Amino acid sequence: MKKMMLLLAIMLLGITNASAQQNDEDLKIKPLLGLWQYAEEVATPDGGTTFIGKQIYKNITWDKKYYVTAGVNIPIKQSEAQETKTSTITFITQEGDIVLGSDNGYLEYINNHYLDNSLNNTISWLRYRFDEKNPNILYLEYNLNGNDENWVSEVWLRVMPYGAK
């Protein structure tokens, strides 16, 4: 009976420790969760800046998966007499896994890149920071060709927090 209780105590301790580690990982990824829209930061006439959203979205989920989708506008005209309408088709361009690194960086394991197969099964290191005044603005940087001169900067706007309906 004592052996059984000792075994049960060891199992519970192991589960508690694994659960605590999982919660730490959850806290690290929580600020990145949600649906993000790629944006271009442009100068305004008054000297400020504004963002122009593009039809590219990145969804980062609790299970540390990410999906990038893109939308393409296609003109549709069913007959000569009908006015041309525009329809947007959205498709997944990239999917993969995220491994958190330091406080301001993570690895993207690109499992599938549907527009550039040479990127399949590759790893990309990303540095990130949030806007000081708005945590829904994310600045990402990644190294394009593996040398220090080719860092690319992107701006992403959170359009929907994780779990929102």
Report residues per predicted region.
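Positively charged n-region of N-terminal signal peptides that target proteins for export
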Residues: 1-4, 19-21
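Sec-dependent N-terminal signal peptides
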Residues: 4-16
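Edge beta-strand at a domain terminus
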Residues: 21, 95-99, 103-104, 139-165
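N-terminal helix-cap/turn-to-beta initiation motif at the start of protein domains
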Residues: 21-37, 165
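Short, solvent-exposed loop/hinge segments that bridge or flank secondary-structure elements
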Residues: 27, 35-72, 114, 119
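Residues that flank catalytic or metal-binding motifs in active/ligand-binding sites
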Residues: 32, 53-56, 63-64, 94, ...
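Short, solvent-exposed coil/turn segments at beta-strand boundaries
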Residues: 58-68, 100-104, 129-138, 159-163
